[in-house]
Amino acid sequence: MRRVTLFLNGSPSNGKVVAVYGTLSDLLSVASSKLGIKATSVYNGKGGLIDDIALIRDDDVLFVCEGEPFIDPQTDARPPGGLLGSHTDWLTLNVGGRYFTTTRSTLVNKEPDSMLAHMFKDKGVWGNKQDHRGAFLIDRSPEYFEPILNYLRHGQLIVNDGINLLGVLEEARFFGIDSLIEHLEVAIKNSQPPEDHSPISRKEFVRFLLATPTKSELRCQCANLQGVKMLCSNAEGASLRLCNFEDPSGLKANLEGANLKGVDMEGSQMTGINLRVATLKNAKLKNCNLRGATLAGTDLENCDLSGCDLQEANLRGSNVKGAIFEEMLTPLHMSQSVR
């Protein structure tokens, strides 16, 4: 008869002395009963896997595992004896067909209210959800799960190139990793390209005009047109709502002689703009700021100027037949218009 001393994997204390009979399966059954675990493998003190009962000698010291890798009791930092609880033992996860080995403490301690913590804080809760290798089955994307597991290990968000942050964010929300969700939302926001608020050049605007069919509307709502020069341009039927034509440096936008028939420029900022002899027939300029604008000789027939600020605007020689001047912000003096 041979006898051996059995210890839990990684533990140097609280061993059990048992007799060795029959096959290796018989020894694993005895170990499971004595140590209160589901024994699947046995190692010697040097980490060698015992796969044959004949390899065991009398008075050998053996370490019993539940499927996790061998842990050397001489170097393992886990607390001894009764402190070796369910929150420090190893387990393997099968996430979408890919295996991850970690500890219960990693899944439980950092985010105790997460789904992973609830799944694994009590030993054996998910015992019926294991594959043939004993790994716990989780039907999620392994590519997005890996950054989450690493975050639970060391507290840093590290995502490899080629992995979509939005995918990691959805997994973090699914597992309830609240602190990681905040990191990911900031990272996604910082990864977005900055908005371009630079002024549009005359060359760029003319290119828009040339690329737009004559029967189609040109839409430039909210464009920044500070100091733009568009002399004699043809923008008939264009939409220029809420555009900014005012340059803080003092350079004034110049649309002298431009064809702006039917243009929608409602709410645009056009202080000091030059619209001399431009055609604005049937245009919509409601609520525009036209302070100091040059509208001399401009065709404003049937133009809607309701709510505009025309203080100090030059309207001499302009055609205001059928123009609408309702709800003006400042009085319109007769000296400003002769026609």
From Swiss-Prot:
Residues covered by the KHA domain: 3-82
Modified residues (Phosphoserine): 11
Chain segments annotated as transmembrane: none
BTB domain segment(s): 89-161
UniProt pathway annotation: Protein modification; protein ubiquitination
InterPro entries named among the record's database cross-references: 5peptide_repeat (IPR001646), BTB/POZ_dom (IPR000210), Doublecortin_dom_sf (IPR036572), KHA_dom (IPR021789), Pentapeptide-BTB/POZ_domain (IPR051082), SKP1/BTB/POZ_sf (IPR011333), T1-type_BTB (IPR003131)
Any one GO biological process: cell maturation
Location of the Pentapeptide repeat domain: 223-247, 253-292, 293-327
Domain of life: Eukaryota
Matching PROSITE patterns: BTB (PS50097), KHA (PS51490)
SUPFAM superfamilies membership: Doublecortin (DC), Pentapeptide repeat-like, POZ domain
Coiled-coil stretches noted in the UniProt entry, renumbered to this chain: none
Short name of one Pfam family: Pentapeptide
Keywords linked to the UniProt accession: Phosphoprotein, Repeat, Ubl conjugation pathway
CDD domains in alphabetical order: BTB_POZ_KCTD9 (cd18368), KHA (cd17073)
GO MF term set: cullin family protein binding
Signal peptide, first to last residue: none
Disulfide bond annotation, renumbered to this chain: none
Keyword Transcription annotated: no
Biological role stated in the UniProt entry: Substrate-specific adapter of a BCR (BTB-CUL3-RBX1) E3 ubiquitin-protein ligase complex, which mediates the ubiquitination of target proteins, leading to their degradation by the proteasome.
Subunit structure: Forms pentamers. Component of a complex mades of five KCTD9 and five CUL3 subunits.
Protein name (Swiss-Prot/TrEMBL): BTB/POZ domain-containing protein KCTD9
Organism in which the protein naturally occurs: Mus musculus
